């Protein structure tokens, strides 16, 4: 099965990219939206996700890898969790404004379903965001 791509959101004041880098790996839990939780359940080991800072500095800042999928949320086993580790920081953050302005990203779930905290990213969207990070 091929690698799938995702986007996970975090408020940097609560848990930032730097926090993840310092920890090396973390349990991604506390998701209480059914669609987002189903996305967590669909993740497989080796899948990659964009790490998105929400609220302040809105933008994609890095790439993480799913290291342990299919875990129950320790606070409520009816919900899902995964373990993730940082892979790399983007050359530069890709802001939400840039994503919204890019016509090839008009259907990205980050824009269409703005409140969704865990979203699937299509291969073309993944590649385009990586291109934007290099410009």
Each model region followed by its residue ranges:
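Hydrophobic beta-strand signal
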Residues: 50-51, 65
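Short beta-strand-centered aromatic/proline hotspots
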Residues: 59-69
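Generic structural hydrophobic/aromatic packing signal, biased to beta-strands
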Residues: 8, 28, 64-66, 84
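A generic structural signal for short beta-strands and their flanking turns/coil linkers
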Residues: 4, 24, 45-47, 60-62, ...
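Intrinsically disordered, low-complexity segments enriched in polar/charged residues with Gly/Pro
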Residues: 27-29, 57, 105-106
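Short, charged beta-turn/beta-strand-edge "cap" motif at the junction between a beta-strand
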Residues: 52-58
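Compositionally biased, charged N-terminal/linker segments
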Residues: 1-45, 135
């Amino acid at each position: 099965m091929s690698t799938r791509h995702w986007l996970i959101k975090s408020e940097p004041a609560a848990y930032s990219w730097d926090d993840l880098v310092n920890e090396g790996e973390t349990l991604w839990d506390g998701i209480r939206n059914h669609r987002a939780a189903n996305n967590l359940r669909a993740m497989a080991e080796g899948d990659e996700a964009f790490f998105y800072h929400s609220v302040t500095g809105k933008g994609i800042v890095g790439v993480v890898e799913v290291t342990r999928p299919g875990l129950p949320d320790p606070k409520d086993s009816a919900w899902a969790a995964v373990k993730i580790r940082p892979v790399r920081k983007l050359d530069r953050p890709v802001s939400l404004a840039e994503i919204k302005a890019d016509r090839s990203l008009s259907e990205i779930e980050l824009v269409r379903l703005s409140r969704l905290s865990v979203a699937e990213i299509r291969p073309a969207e993944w590649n385009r965001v990586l291109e934007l990070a290099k410009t």
